[in-house]
């Protein structure tokens, strides 16, 4: 990629591209806006810069008694549109391929932990905001402990559900203030958008708040590979919810993903405000796979009460520890704690041990 194209190179690129700005910019290795700025400067200096050959002169239409010239099309020519779609696909492809497994380099030696926050719903009157305050403080006070969020940060009532703001004392504007306070409380290893969050559509405010915190935010799934200094890799597959359900086994979704999917070390999901856990062995690689569902900080839920859903919450969160000093196939490489203070104490114990 050249740093600066000459005027002659720009003219030749436009000629080769038959005047298509997007194609010429791509050939020159500059963005289209930069190319247009250069073209305007060249025209101001007297250069004759060709228009797109695809913008054919508009012929007048003769109706006998009168004629008129049709208006120019208000959209880009099809050839430029196709070039734009090609570039958009390449951007999409680059993002999707990179998202299949996101590498995260762990820079500190020894054991680490992840506190997976269940559905926060921080603006709901039934949310235990004091517990959120304690648990974010625990993350900040514990060396090697990272925070993670499985989604539904706020109620985010939209559409016909917007009427439900009348049933809570927190306004929509206040909800985003609390969400920002929550996200800025600690550093996040990953953040997932829940179904409530995604009701915002493409303009999801959480995406921008997370970006300000340099947090990894994914709207549906974050599959990450924690790579430790000793070469060990531990994979975490986090979703707001894994496909599949069973009245007999609330951990069915993440278990199904483990057995029929990517064979990662840890699967974590939220969504249904229930705690569940199952452990499996991958017979091929020998690793132990942990399938977890975390509940919610929305302790008192009128919807659940009205529908007769039972209380299946062990804790609003789960804390998992990873001990990289153990072999990859060791069954205790990953441990799950439902009481975060107990998990943090165990993590401190592991970190005191010689690496």
Feature names for model-found ranges:
Residues 1-113:
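Acidic, histidine-bearing metal-coordination/catalytic regions of metal-dependent phosphoesterases
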Residues 104-114, 223-237, 286-289:
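Beta-strand-turn-beta hairpins that frame and shape the catalytic cleft
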Residues 207, 232-237, 242-346, 350:
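Conserved beta-sheet core of the metallophosphoesterase superfamily
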Residues 118-121, 151-154, 194-197, 241-243, ...:
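Active-site metal-binding loops of divalent metal-dependent hydrolases
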Residues 114-116, 147-149, 191, 237, ...:
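Residue-level marker for buried hydrophobic side chains located in beta-strands
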Residues 108, 122-222:
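Core catalytic region of metal-dependent phosphoesterases/phosphodiesterases
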Residues 52-73, 317, 333-355:
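Metal-centered catalytic cores of metalloenzymes
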Residues 114-123, 165, 236, 240-242:
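Short, basic, glycine/proline-bearing loop/turn elements
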